[in-house]
Amino acid sequence: GAPDRLEMLLDKRVVAMADYDREHGTAYLQTAIMSVRFPGSPADAAAALNVHRNTYFYRMNKVRELFFIDLKDGDDRLALSFSASIMEGMEK
């Protein structure tokens, strides 16, 4: 069906991040999304997440380490943004 076709479009790293967050009570996906939403402004991204800047930087390092997503890379930013939007739509 349609959800199956949509799932094929998702970046596997983003799906893995969402699964990891669910299993471990972390917020890596939301942190990465805020990084894309507030490009070049870690302070604004941290404020949107209601966390200290150091917490934001720690999480972003974990995103790179655990999921091999570098949000300084345009393709990775696009993959995250696109996949997160589809996943959000599938939850509704």
Residue ranges and their predicted role:
Residues G1-K92:
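Cytosolic nucleotide-utilizing catalytic cores of signal-transduction proteins
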